[in-house]
């Protein structure tokens, strides 16, 4: 009888302490659930950028076989008495003027509009922000005020009520540089010493314009089409600069690039470019 009791007690103790898990496996069921491999999250697709454009048809019989001809053919009163790059730049301004005038005459807008010719055959139209052009200056650090600064800022009071005047110039410099690159490819002489300075210098001034818009007219900045137009224009400017930088080397363009990437007083410009313009220019070696 005593032996039977002893066997029963031994059996109960065996089942009380028996663990069928691997003796080396100390992980609880709950912990195993936590360390289970999770599926990789699906990447969020990039937002498709979009801004409304209009067609800009040819208005004369100028030969459109090259970039120069594409621009000149869309201008009712083109400039033709200077070097081709300068003619393209100035004729871009004239195209902008005819686009604005057409908007006013057709009563598409209530105030003086901004209108920008996008090479080779499109345009983007938008009204002006609600502040004076001089407000942009404080967003341009001293290290990034180069040769064209005094021409378009400082004592220059023309177009004072139109901040997008800076973008007007930016687009004109881009188009002039497009012609310089195309002419080089086609064996056409290019007389300018600095065809690539305009795109990078005015990229800086245009970023400053966007910074001013964001601070001084946030409702305007929240117009996604304007942001997308500026993104597209900045991207084009960087592409042109990279393509022509070594073809047309010039000291100022390298100083602008270096200061943009490294100067302490340009930190706000860099931060804005990283946030809104995919760090264009900042990753160029």
Name each region found by the language model.
Residues 1-21:
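Sec-dependent N-terminal signal peptides
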Residues 20-45:
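Sec-dependent signal peptide cleavage junction
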Residues 37-66:
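Non-catalytic accessory regions used for complex assembly or targeting
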Residues 71-86:
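Short pre-active-site segment immediately N-terminal to the catalytic Zn-binding motif
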Residues 85-101:
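Active-site recognition of the HExxH zinc-binding catalytic motif
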Residues 98-145:
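Post-HEXXH active-site segment of zinc metalloproteases
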Residues 142-185:
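Extracellular-facing segments of soluble proteins and assemblies that are Gly/Ser/Thr-biased and enriched
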Residues 174-285:
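Pan-zinc metallopeptidase signature
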């Amino acid at each position: 009888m005593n032996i039977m009791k002893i066997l029963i007690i031994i059996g109960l103790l065996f089942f009380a302490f028996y663990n069928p898990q691997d003796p080396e496996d100390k992980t609880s069921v709950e912990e195993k659930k936590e360390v289970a491999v999770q599926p990789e999250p699906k990447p969020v697709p990039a937002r498709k950028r979009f801004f409304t454009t209009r067609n800009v048809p040819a208005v004369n019989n100028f030969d459109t076989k090259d970039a120069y001809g594409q621009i000149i053919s869309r201008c009712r009163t083109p400039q033709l008495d200077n070097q081709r790059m300068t003619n393209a730049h100035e004729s871009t301004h004239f195209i902008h003027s005819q686009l604005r005038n057409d908007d006013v005459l057709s009563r598409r807008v209530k105030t003086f509009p901004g209108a920008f010719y996008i090479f080779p055959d499109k345009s983007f139209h938008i009204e002006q922000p609600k502040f004076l052009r001089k407000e942009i200056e404080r967003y341009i650090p001293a290290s990034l005020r180069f040769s064209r600064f005094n021409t378009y800022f400082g004592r220059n009071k023309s177009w004072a009520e139109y901040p997008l005047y800076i973008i007007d110039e930016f687009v004109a410099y881009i188009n002039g540089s497009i012609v310089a690159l195309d002419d080089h490819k086609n064996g056409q002489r290019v007389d300018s010493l600095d065809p690539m300075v305009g795109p990078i210098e005015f990229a800086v001034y245009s970023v400053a314009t966007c910074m001013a818009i964001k601070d001084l007219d946030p409702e305007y900045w929240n117009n996604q089409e304007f942001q997308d137009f500026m993104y597209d224009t900045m991207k084009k400017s960087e592409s042109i600069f990279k393509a022509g930088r070594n073809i047309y080397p010039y000291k100022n363009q390298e100083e602008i690039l270096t200061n943009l990437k490294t100067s302490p007083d340009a930190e706000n410009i860099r931060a804005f470019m990283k946030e809104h313009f995919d760090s264009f220019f900042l990753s160029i070696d």
